[in-house]
Amino acid sequence: MFNLFILLLERVGLIIIIAYMLMNINHFKTMMGEREKLRSQWQLTILFALFAITSNFTGIEIENGHIVSSNIYYQLNDDASMANTRVLTIGMSGLIGGPFVAIIVGIVSGLSRLYIGGANAYTYLISSIFIALISGFYGYRTMRRYTYPTVLMGAIIGALNEAIQMACILIFANDTASAWSLVQFIALPMILINSIGTAIFLSIILSTLKQEEQTRAIQTHDVFEIANKTLPYFRSGLTEQSARSVAEIILKLMNVSAVAITNRTDILTHVGAASDHHVAKKAIITDLSKEVIKTGHLKEAHSKEEIGCNNPNCSLTSAIVIPLMINQEVAGTLKFYFTNEYENTTSTKQLARGLADIFSSQLELGQAEMQSKLLKDAEIKSLQAQVNPHFFFNSINTISALVRIDSEKARKLLLQLSQFFRSNLQGARNNTITLGKELQQVEAYLALEQARFPDRFTIQYHIDSSCKHVLIPPFVIQILVENAIKHAFKHRRKDNIIDVVAHHDNEELTLTVRDNGSGIDDDKLPLIGQMSVDSETGTGSALENLNRRLIGLYGTKAALHFESTEIGTTVSCHIPSHTIKEDI
């Protein structure tokens, strides 16, 4: 009997070792945490069915109360029986997967035992189904509460399952005396082994899941602590100053060798190891970062070659690079570097991903706040334009002069002035208007300007018929046309032409305003739309405001694009196509 106990202990040990190895694989951890899902149920069924079949074929042959052999068996003599760990696998399948898993595993286990044969082999098919039902329905009770059976309860059910098998051997045996002799020999070792094995199996699962839960709790705490300390910085945007403050906090609180943050083209900050050549304000030098910006997906590197730094003395050997997203576009990257590859763990990767998500949200919130401010600024400027004494008095004086000369034209201009004020007010209160309404606004403005300066400029429209209902931000064309009138022609009084072009395809609207003026100075061209540029006729703040609004609403693809030569300037932008019908 003691020899049987030792041999069974070996079989149980094999199953437990395999279970321990599986529970260290992330896929199986996830499966155990989602065991109520159908996909997990089928995976558990296949896993425990393989365990059950293995248990049957690695059993210990017993005949006339003696151990005959412990080799792998495919067939038994008609008078022989077998001691194995089959009941353990069926019971565990039920406790973990519930009745669905247990019944299928029980049938598979019973049929494979029936195939091996031996004395009263059909008995084990019957007992397998009973054991599956009992353990399966108890497992179902715990699944409904999203818990697992305790180790003690597992040990009790394990012993009970083996006791049921002993009872089935006695009840369904053809030779009661032989059955009783068999039960006397195998009952105690098998009940003890099944009870102990079930308890250990459950303890491995429970301890692994508890450790996983504790790890997640620590990660969550770390993420919240870092997020809480970095919260104020990214709300102001992805700048060198905000990036450096955030990187220093992360380096202090996390087990990493270096932290870097970039925008799409440049290193904003790099603190920690390798700071001598990973320098802020310089272009991105690692191939890994360039790949993340290109694909928008997290990337890992586990060697210097994979990082792609061209400095031979770089001490960085491992890295995690996560994209920072704004409105589903890559705005930059968050990079964790390691001088020891073993520090680059799965938990660090998950923590990095969580931080990147939070930082991306903060950047989006910051941009939304900036857009709100820009819209308010645009509204204020628009309202100011309505009561701008210079513009207002010039228009009124022009109309007054025309009253005596051409009263009908004066009446039309007065209506245009009213239309201009009304359109300005409506545009200031809406995020988008149709291209048709924007053109009406432009016409009203041009009518007033042409009345003041007859024949000074000519406006030519090239508008696709499908464009009229496409939605655009207010004042886009008006600002571009007004900019051309004020800055393009300087003191030239004739042959001044402005072309307004709108082209529409299925995905985007292309707006272009082109003039034949004197062009923009080469030293000022890169600054136009990026910042205020002082000149004799203004500061260019309207173009800067418009450009920032377009980028904030639609991304960098919608930014104003300037081309200028000595024979004219072309300003264009590409806006995603949305019609008024789609927005209603």
Curated annotation (Swiss-Prot):
SUPFAM superfamilies listed in its UniProt record: ATPase domain of HSP90 chaperone/DNA topoisomerase II/histidine kinase
Modified residues (Phosphohistidine): H390
One Gene Ontology molecular-function label: phosphorelay sensor kinase activity
Group of enzyme by EC: transferase
Histidine kinase domain location: 379-461
GO cellular component: plasma membrane
Compartments in which it is found: Cell membrane
UniProt keywords, alphabetically: ATP-binding, Cell membrane, Kinase, Membrane, Nucleotide-binding, Phosphoprotein, Transferase, Transmembrane, Transmembrane helix, Two-component regulatory system
Protein name, as recorded: Sensor protein LytS
Organism: Staphylococcus haemolyticus (strain JCSC1435)
Lineage: Bacteria, Bacillati, Bacillota, Bacilli, Bacillales
